Amino acid sequence: MNLAFRFSYFGDRFFGSQMQPDLCTVEGEFIGACRLLRLFDDWREANFATAGRTDRGVHARSQVCSFLTDKPERAIEALNRVLPADIWCTGWAEAPDGFHPRYSAVSRTYRYYFSAPGDAAAMHEAAQEFLGRHDFSAFARAGDRNPERRILASRVFIDGEFAVFEVTGESFLWNMVRCMATMLGRVGRGEAEAGEIARLLTGPVERRVAAAPPEGLILWDIDYGIPFTPLPIDAGSSRHLGDRHRYHVLMAKISAHLAQDHRQPDTPGI
């Protein structure tokens, strides 16, 4: 049976998602879990594939992989028990004939989180420049053979203390979303206007936009037009999520206090 799994991960521990010899990657951990369960012996013969690669430090809410196995029940029941705590499956589907997680995707959605957004309304207005089909050469590495991409939706909204850039497209170039985020961040800080994005999309490429830091990026969703059966998160991953949240809330508070002006008087009695 050709099984598809939707899964999430924190990207900070991995050297990207794509399999690399002697390096810890998301694919390497997933394939290792499949081998441990004897779902297949050779990942190539099992046609193991993912929807696309994410760089080191990039996270995923909805990555997708598929592979052939004659033990589908074992895969569905046990994968979450043997995967590391920072990778967990959230759904599964019996993949239709001809399915490939990369080439069968109808669209992909990414979110980029800005911790100090500035003018979010200006960022949202500038994000509309990305809509439609454009040459994104200025927003990707040099040498991409076909730099044209079609953006289906693009917006910036506020989520608590963060501004979130959410973009949906048929496909994306390497580092494209992070480069788009760089320009929106500049707009939010008043360092650029929406017209500069329009010029980068239509004019000759005189310079390429630098990519924003990877830790703010999440592969948010991939649409295949097929239903996935939800899978419950296992206890280990649930604890890991809670522990990470508590740690970062604590560190945010400590960092805020350490960043205060040292000339302020100490709190009495301490």
From Swiss-Prot:
Which Cys residues form disulphide pairs?
none
Q: What class of enzyme is it?
A: isomerase
Q: Does the keyword Cytoplasm apply?
A: no
Q: Which residues bind substrate?
A: 110
Gene Ontology MF terms: RNA binding; tRNA pseudouridine(38-40) synthase activity
Active site (catalytic residues): 55 (nucleophile)
Q: What is the lineage of its organism?
A: Archaea, Methanobacteriati, Methanobacteriota, Stenosarchaea group, Methanomicrobia
Which PANTHER family does the record cross-reference, listed alphabetically? PSEUDOURIDYLATE SYNTHASE, TRNA PSEUDOURIDINE SYNTHASE-LIKE 1
- By what name is this protein known? tRNA pseudouridine synthase A
| GO biological-process terms attached to the record | tRNA pseudouridine synthesis
